[in-house]
Every structure is written in structure tokens, then in C-alpha cells.
Amino acid sequence: MSEQTQELDLNGEMLVRREKLAALRAKGNPFPNTFRRDALAQDLHANYDALEGEALKAQEVEVKVAGRIMTRRAMGKATFITLQDMSGRIQLYVARDNLPEGIYADDVGQWDLGDIIGVKGTLFKTKTNELTVRCTEVQLLTKALRPLPDKFHGLSDQETRYRQRYLDLIANEDSRRTFIIRSKVIAGIREYFLSKGFMEVETPMLQIIPGGASARPFVTHHNALDVDMYLRIAPELYLKRLVVGGFERVFELNRNFRNEGVSVRHNPEFTMLEYYQAYADYHDLMDNTEELLRKLAMDILGTTIVPYGELEFDFGKPFERITMHDAILKYGAEKGIVKEDLYDFDRAVAVAKKLGIEVQKSWGLGSLVNVIFEEVAEHHLIQPTFLMAHPAEISPLARRNDENPEVTDRFELFIGGREIGNGFSELNDAEDQNERFDAQVAAKEAGDDEAMFKDEDFVTALEHGLPPTAGEGLGIDRLAMLFANAASIRDVILFPAMKQK
């Protein structure tokens, strides 16, 4: 069928539906708000599916249900309807002889797929043993002027699914399941941290100085203050101010914004968990993370084995822990990379160029080691792995390692070759932090758009004393991708960023 023919068919069907709505208006309010349901489809199935037909009949269970008409099969003086609510689907049996006179012909006969109705009736089992509501009262609650996307195959066009998520949720059970899982991930995280004595807080989304991560920010202007402001790229510096102030365990579940590329793993607006714990180090946080992910897996999937595409991730086993240098040497040996290459700037430049990496002038040895890791090792970290000991150059907020000050007490969590989280023992030496901010300013002046801004007030806060602290950020969208087995970040964000048509 051509696009033009489809448009004509759509216009014709909408015209018929509008005529039906006009007739309803003539009778009164076509959008009543007096119906109150007392049952959801999922609960009815859970409570009564196992009952035999005679036993169910003897109980005379009366229910009120409401939802959207997804299918209908007219059979003379009766119609079978599939009703969908937020929990699932239930079958309705609407027969002329069970309704007041004239209702079946005048009302039920005017219903269309997509209409929202409320019904009252008793439960029974059909000859095929399907739980069904025998309707004795019916009411149209909302007339749908547009038809459902595809009566037989659901909504399959990917772009339409993202642009018109409401249609996707109506038509695709898998999409509804995905966002239920996402909600459970967030609820599970919140429950975990509250149970550990953490306090949930909110920090500014609009910031004078964007900090806490290396990323390009969105810029806006505050008219009343006549000052440029930034959508936050991370809440880190504000959360650590709270630890200075005496809130020793804090967490925030909220949005971050980064004015960067869009991909199957990146959206400019995304949700993060960040939490900070005083009198803890990065080893404690790795332990927390393992415990949290195991709990989420059990609560959401009922198992610590998490399927993802053709892979399976085992959250039940201890997560591997490996340093960045060791990961490069382990997976880069076949490319001829040796230990000495990672401790000498010129040798690291040579390795990077051999790997086809375009070396930036602003990079020092630490940045070179990082890009070499990304090229040769990152995609090998399939099972849950904590990557540790990142160079200080790329970790401006992390505490230096006592044994090797060139690296930091930092970790990143990788699952399926993708970074899921980032944490470290916090730098609480105000003078060291000030020097690292200055180095970031120099990098920005040298052309690094993602280098951090200097936050003088944060340095002042550190001068008042930050207790030994560790903090971590976990990407909620990427966690949701894992637990929902979703291939793209757009599949787990209700309304992802899209280019305008």
C-alpha cells in the first residue's frame, strides 16, 4: 500500500470517528469522569486463572475494569473485546442480552479499536478456559479519533517508536516491560541506599560553573541575574560540599546534561546515581557496587545471571579487578605493547600512532595511556570488571595512590565492554586540588573543550576540611539497558533526543 493510499485511509477513518464523536456530543458529555474501576487485569489473572470454571461461577466475582480496546470480534449479538490497562490484558464478553435495551446497538456498536471504556460484570471462564468479564454495564470514557498504529503487527517503525512513545507503549508489550524494569532499577537503588543510612538530596541543575566531569556543557542565560549559566554535567562538587557540611552519606538520582554526540550509548540528557560516603575508600565502593547489582538482578530478574543479546553476565561471582596498565598489557601484548611503553611519553605517542589514534597536543602521558586502553582493552572487559589505577592526569578529582602518585585510587565498572560506573577515593587535599584545576584550565586553553572549569568555591570548601571520602556515579540508563536486554539507550529513555523532522 502506498503512503498516499495509507494517508487517505487514515483521513477516512478519522472522519468516521469524528462523526461518531459528534453524535456522542449531541447526547451529552462524551468524556465522562465518573467511572471508578476496582480491579486490574494482572490481579484478576493472578487471583482467578487457576480456578476451574464451575468454582469461579460459584463465587460470583463482580468487578469493574477500565482500559483501551485492543481487539474486538463481533459474533452476531455478542462481541469479545481485549481490554488493556496498565497491568496487562483481560477479555470482555459484551452481549446484547446482558445489557439494558438499546445499549448494544447504540453504544457498543459505535466503539472502535483504541477507544477507552469502563465496564462492570462478573468473571467466568470460556470454553477455551480464558478468564473473561461478562459485562452487565458498559461506558465509553474516551473516544479515540486516530486508529491504533498497526492492527496486526504492533508498532515496528523504530523512529516512530521513539518520536511517539505513547503509541509504542500502547502497541508493544516489550516496551512497556522495559520501562517497568527501568522503574524497578531506580526504586531498587533508592531502597538500597536508604537502607544503608544515606540521605537523598537534590543539588542545582543550573550552575554558574559546571564541574564534576570532563564534558562539554549546555549554556543558557539567566535574564534576571544577567549571567550565563550551565546545565549541570555532574552533581559531584555540590555533593562533596554537603559531606564537608557534615552530611556523611548522601546520594542523588537525577539528570545530567552533556552537549556531545548521540549514539546507542549516549543521550545528551541522562540519569545518574551519584553517592558519597565519608570514612570509606574506593575498595568499599566497589564492594557496595557488587552488592547493589546482585540485589537488583535478584529483585528484577530473580537470578544473578543477566542475559544481554548473545551474552550472559554473571553478577553472582566476584567482579574481576584489574589496573589500567595490566589490562593494556594483557590485551595489547599481541600488538607488541610492553610495560616500558606506558611509562615513557615518546614511546606512548609511538604506540598510539601505530594504533591509528590521532594524538592531541594537549595530551600528557596519562591521556595517552587512557586512549591506548580504550583502543586495545576496553572491548575485552565483558564480564563485570572493575578497572583501577587511572592516571592522575585524567582523574582531576580523585585521590592519588599512596604507593604510586602518578595514578589514583579510582575505578570504572565495565560490563559488556561498556563503562557503567565511575568512582574513586576523593581528593581532599585542597592545595593538590587547586593545582589540578589549574592543569585543567591549561588544557582547556590548549584546545581541550572537555577539560574542567576551575571552581574556586569548591577549593574553599576543601580548605574547611573534607573527611576521607569515596564517591561513585552509576549510569541509570545503561543499567536499565542491561536488565531490560535493550540494544540502544533510546530504548530505555521514554523520550530520547531526536533530530527535528
UniProtKB/Swiss-Prot annotation:
Its cofactor is Mg(2+). The lineage of its organism: Bacteria, Pseudomonadati, Pseudomonadota, Gammaproteobacteria, Pasteurellales. Keywords: Aminoacyl-tRNA synthetase, ATP-binding, Cytoplasm, Ligase, Magnesium, Metal-binding, Nucleotide-binding, Protein biosynthesis. Homodimer. It comes from Pasteurella multocida (strain Pm70). Binds 3 Mg(2+) ions per subunit. This is Lysine--tRNA ligase. Mg(2+) 1 binds at residues 412, 419. It holds the Pfam family tRNA_anti-codon. Mg(2+) 2 binds at residue 419. One of its GO terms (molecular function) is tRNA binding.
